Amino acid sequence: MEKRVLVIEDYSSIGNCSLTAGIPILSAFGTYPVGLPTALLSTQTAGIKGFTFVDLCDNMIPAYKHWKKLGIKFDCVYIENDKGRNRS
């Protein structure tokens, strides 16, 4: 049985990073990744100015509580480290 991994990262609509990269990589390792986005960005932040940013943190706990009501459990959690990220 596949291990279910909760992936907590932002979602960059354009770029090869964040949830768009993490989910397929974890899936390739034979896990069942479930994304919990922290934010929605128009593009990745590295080297790109003027991107748009929508904070989704207020939705994280309600989403998790919904999964809990459904009996969904996770074997492990992967949390993005965005230390030093430029949000300009």
Show the residue positions of the predicted features:
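Ribokinase/PfkB-type carbohydrate-kinase core domain
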Residues: E2-S88
